[in-house]
Amino acid sequence: MADNIQRGEEFEKKAEKKISGWGLFGSKYEDAADFYDKAANCFKLAKSWDRAGSTYVKLSTVIQSSDSKHEAAQAYADAGHCYKKTSAKEAISCLEQAAYLFLDNGRFNMAGKYYKEIAELYELEQNFEQAIIYFEKAADIYQSEEATTAANQCNAKVAQFAAQLEQYQKAIQIYEDIGRPSLNNNLLKYGVKGHLLNAGICQLCKGDVVAITNALDRYQEMDPTFSGTREYKLLVDLAAAVDEEDVVKFTDAVKEFDSMTQLDAWKTTLLLRVKEAIKAKELEEDDLT
């Protein structure tokens, strides 16, 4: 490990010497880039991630001097991947630069990939507001490139975090927008009932019984097969429980569905919010009597 660090430092010195020395403009930067690349690889082998990351940043700067945007972008991406192991902030900064350079070079799918990586880092940091911003950026790029599946995955993440932040209408709109065109795609249509279930749960969180009923009617029109699914039955039963302010009925409906198809943490969290809202209404009415 120490040997690799020493070798890395030697390559780094050679790179700096090339840049500051005499030589043809193009060739000296190419040689320096080669030395920085070797130095970064040595630091990676030594698991010295910060040094590897900073060396890749130097590599990108040198490459940009020779106007090779694709390679410069890739060097920033490599820096970001090294920094992922030590500093989310530095990783995000480098991946942002990579995405910018790929966009500038017309490599839109690559830019989308790195915006998505940034969003995932913010997700790990529990910074859902920023995660939404970067998943939206990635989704927009994928949509423009007609990469529908990738765009849907990013938009679903936006909806997930929007709902967690109680931005229910935004989440509903996204889930419905994903579900509608997916009905005409043989690969995507089987996921529609899941998107409609998620949208319906968000409707329940808003607590507007009329809106919930209207949404269920709309989902049946959108997908005539939906009314025959367990997801639809769950939403109908939950809507009735909300309307009747019946916590027991609500709990039983959730338990029945969960016994066949386990609810994930996101759905469980939102359904608990609805349940607590019903309980709060019951307490209000008890106080009034």
Swiss-Prot record:
Q: Main location per UniProt?
A: membrane
Q: Name one GO cellular component term.
A: membrane
Location in the cell: Membrane
Give me the TPR repeat coordinates as residue ranges.
Answer: 112-145
**Signal sequence range:** none
| Membrane topology, as annotated | Peripheral membrane protein
One Gene Ontology term of the biological-process aspect is: vesicle-mediated transport
- Give the UniProt keywords, A-Z: ER-Golgi transport, Membrane, Protein transport, TPR repeat, Transport
State the superkingdom: Eukaryota
Which PANTHER family does the entry mention? ALPHA-SOLUBLE NSF ATTACHMENT PROTEIN (PTHR13768:SF8), SOLUBLE NSF ATTACHMENT PROTEIN SNAP (PTHR13768)
The family classification in the record reads: Belongs to the SNAP family.
Q: What is the purpose of this protein?
A: Required for vesicular transport between the endoplasmic reticulum and the Golgi apparatus.
Name used for this protein in its record: Alpha-soluble NSF attachment protein
From the broadest rank down, the organism's phylogenetic lineage runs: Eukaryota, Viridiplantae, Streptophyta, Embryophyta, Tracheophyta
